[in-house]
Amino acid sequence: MLERGKMDRDMVEFVVIDQLVPKEHLLRKVDAAVDFTRLYEMVEPLYCEDNGRPSIDPVVLFKMVLIQHLYGLPSLRRTAEEVSLNVAYRWFLGYTLQEETPHFSTVSYNFRHRFTEKTVDKVFAWILDEVANAGYLSPRAVFIDGTHIKASANTKKQVKEHIPAASKHYAKELMEEVNADREAHGKKPFDDEPPTSPRKPKDNTSKKKLARRKKQGFRTVTQSTTDPDCGLFVKGEHKRQFAYEAHTACDKNGFVLETVVTPGNVHDSVAFDEVYDKVTKNFPQVEAIVADAAYKRPHICKKVFDDGRVLSTAYKRPQTMKGGHEWWKYVYDAFYDCVLCPEYQPLNYSTTNRDGYPEYKSDPNICGACPTRERCTHSKNCVKTVQRHIWKDYEELADDARYTPEYRELYKKCKETIERVFADAKEKHAMRYTRYRGLAQVTNWVKLKFVAMNLKKLAMWNWRHHFHLLIFRLFYSEYARNPVVS
């Protein structure tokens, strides 16, 4: 039987807002997980105590941003519209059905000018403390990786810029060991100070050296005119876009421990030091670092193993000549300090370059008559050069860890930890691209997104734990009153 619904839109009804929100709603779980009044202690120094108009409750502002990131809303303007229409959002903020909600520009202005990066860091650390107090944090093994975030910039609006080359964190330590290695082999140590240009150079060699040194101090980058802080991210032959890179660390339960945002053209290994230092400072109980092959660099291996930790990484494909001998056929002899080639001929030490690679070169008279020279070298002077980093032993320690069952199984968890964090952030929380511009704004945006993800996981786990505990208590009380003997 066809029934026509009534369109009585002027009906007056008395309701309780709490009854309109389902008992298992996500915001109920989030509200029960933490005490949001802790936010007042963090933002109190940012407000004047006895002057100015009464402000909007800062807890409400933070809750609105949490709603945006929890549900993957694209902008604060859209979030403000949803808050004014959604009963559950109003209940979470503590607003009645007819009370006016904050304007999106108010939220945007406060997070741009009032709440600084330190405020966001305090909120991030506070949620991690709540997770640790609940017993869900497990930082013994830390998983580190990076993911790109598409920037709000057009790839066609770009310019070429010459910028100073960034100095490496380990440059001083590396140069000291390079000079020590050169002196041990009777070589002259490198001069760290660049040579000054004389008024009347003696020969052209000095000019070439000065030009080469000056050129090495700068690099050419593609810079966006819309957002100069982002970088050109290149992956493969076709993917080129302006982006930011979120270098992130998480534990085995998927809780984000730290994140560092850089331009998209910064390699993962370059940003590793900052992420690693922050994680180990906040969580000194870290025992293992799990990362992919992009982090298998000599200085990273040395840094991790010198700290008494283990680096668990993947197999890194060697970059050898196509159709040539396998890399493992060139064996380093530590006793004689030489390299044996596949034809069992020694490659003796020649020099150590500034990058930390001792060079071992063959005898051209022997290589000229070698039957497998075409598979070894194509140089005109018939000299084969093999480089071996002075910190190569630390890379071999990482390879040894890769073959142990414990760390092999630990690396397999990357797909369900750090990769899962990135997948959820992009698919469920709208982190695939950002509408913000500037490194500072994007950094706060990413950290608040990870705050929402950590808080959501904490709320879900707390709710599930209390639910299972309630079921156990009901079952135990029923069993105590009426035990069943099978």
Feature roles, as predicted:
Residues 1-28:
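Hydrophobic alpha-helical membrane-insertion signals
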Residues 3-4, 65, 72-85, 96-486:
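Anion-binding and metal-coordination hotspots
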Residues 23-66, 71-72:
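Basic, short loop/linker segments at the boundary and entry of helix-turn-helix/winged-helix-like folds
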